[in-house]
Amino acid sequence: MATIEINYHNIKQNAINLKKEAKDIIAVVKNNAYNLDLKECVKIFSEAGINYFATTKEEECKIIRETLGEEVSIFLLNPTRDFELVRKYNIEVNIANLDYLKENIDELRDLTLQLEFAGSMRRAGAKTLDEVLEIINFCKENNLNLKGFWSHFSFADEFDGFYEKEKELALKVLEEALKIHDFEVVHLQNSASFLRDGAFEKTTHQRLGIILYGALPYDVKQYPVALPNLVIKNPITVYGEIVNIVDLKEGECIGYSNAYIAQKDKKVGVVNIGYGEGILRDRLRGNTCIINNEEKDIYATMMSHLVVEISEKEKIGDKVFLYDDIQQLHDYVKYFGPNSVQLAALNYNSLNVKKIY
C-alpha cells in the first residue's frame, strides 16, 4: 500500500519560523486544515504560540473551540446565519455587506464582528469605500462590536501588476476606515502577500494558510521574496514501491491505450500508486519520481499504478517518491495550479498514513 508521511514537527517549526517574521498570525485552518487534520494542526499551532484561527465552516469553528478551549480567538470567514452556534462557541462573525447587518441586527448585537473589504476577490464584504464607511457608522450607531477589518488579495501570487493595484486600493480603504474607527484586529495579507512584501505597517496580523503547511505560494527562484531568512520545511512525503518489473520488447506497449510504447528493449517498473490515491494526474503525466535518490521518468499513469523508468539496479520493493524533500509540493504548481488543489485531493482511504511528531 502506498504511504503518506505527515510531519507535524515540521508544520510546527514552520509556524515558529513564521511567527518570528510576522506581527502576529491568524492561522487559516479551513477544509480540515488543508486536508492535514484540523485537530492535529490547531494543537501544534497553539503549541507554537498561535492563538487566532480562521476557517470557512461553522462546524470547524466548533471543533477548534472544543479542542483548544476558550483561550483562543476564532474567526468564521464566511458570513453565517447560524447565530445560535456562533454565540454558543464565541465565534467572530464576518459582515457580508450592509444589508446583512440591517437584516440581522437583533441577532448580531451581542456578537463580535469583522468588516471585510471585498476588493478584487468579491466573495463577500463591502464593495466600495463608501460602503465600508457606512458599515462602520451603522455599527457605531447601533452599538455593535466591530473588532476587525480584513480583505483578501486574489492576485498576490501573480506578477503581472494586478496585485499592486489591489494592494494599493485595500490600503487606501483601510487608511480611511482607520480615521473613524480603531480596529483591534487588521489582517489583509495571505501567504503570498506576506512572502513578497513582509508585514504591512498598519496591520496587526498576517492571515497565513498554505505556507504554514510547507508549500510556498509562488516560485521563489523566479520571483522576489521579502523574507530571505525564512525557512519553510516540507511536511509531506508520498511514496509507493515497485511491485513488479516488466521486460518490454521494442514496440511493445504498457498501460491503457498504448500509454507507453518502448522505443527499445527495456525494463520498466510498475508502482503501487496512482491518481486513485489523490495524486493529481497533471503532477504525474510527463513528470518524474525519485527512486534511490535518482530522478526517473514516469511513463504511464493509472488509477492504482504507475509505470516508471528503472535501471538495472532497481528491484521490487524499492520506494518510489512522488513528494519528498527533493520534489516538494510547490515544485509542481506550474503543472496543476495552487498547492491547495493537491492537498485537498489526497485520498487517505487509499494511503497508509504515518504521522511524525
Placement of each model-derived feature along the sequence:
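Anionic-ligand-binding alpha/beta catalytic cores of soluble enzymes and soluble regulatory domains
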Residues: 160-264
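Short beta-strand-to-turn element immediately C-terminal to the catalytic PLP-Schiff-base lysine
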Residues: 126-127, 196, 243, 310
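Active-site metal-binding loops of divalent metal-dependent hydrolases
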Residues: 31-32, 153, 191, 210-211, ...
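C-terminal accessory subdomain/extension
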Residues: 245-357
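Active-site-proximal beta-alpha core segment in soluble small-molecule metabolic enzymes
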Residues: 2-6, 10-13, 23-178, 182-185, ...
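Short aromatic-glycine motifs in intrinsically disordered, low-complexity regions
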Residues: 1-3, 133, 137, 224-234
